[in-house]
Amino acid sequence: RVISMSNNHSYDKGAQGIAATLRFWDDMPDDVVTTGLYAGEADYGNIPIQEKEGVRIAYLAYTETTNGLPTPSDAAANVIYTSQEDVIQQQIELARQQADIVVVGVHWGVEGSHTPTDAQRALGQKIADWGADVIIGTHPHVIQPVELLTAAGTGKTVPIAYSLGNFVSTQAAANNMVGVILTFDITKTT
């Protein structure tokens, strides 16, 4: 079980909300992995990894926006924005060294749009090039395409789901009532 805490609502309730979120998820069983909130820059190297049947899986999460809210000055943790490409690259490369599979979640794009933006496509390709194995997008509240990218240098095929739509929502528009569950098999070969 993996919980991404990096999205446009991460800062909605300020430092108290961040602290309450961290406390809640810290009390979960050990098989629950959280990602997307970091206790400052010193914590960026702490890559969330879960081992399943001998396969080490790293989970990273980023957000494009926090709806204009800055990181609260007294917050116990912060998100990493999609504009922080140097940090994202460093984390993916570090995760690649520590794990067999690197899964990257990105909260991005335009709400209500079925078409990925140029920025989504560009960052998605960079994330693939930096070493991600799977890229899972959220935020638009509607389904966007699932495609296969080719990582530069390695030629590795990297699936990207630009937006899974809504899983559970109170939004009434027909397009907002549809979501996708992305499934994939992981097989360790070496």
For each feature predicted by the language model, list its residue ranges.
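Acidic, metal/ion-coordinating pockets
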Residues: 1-190
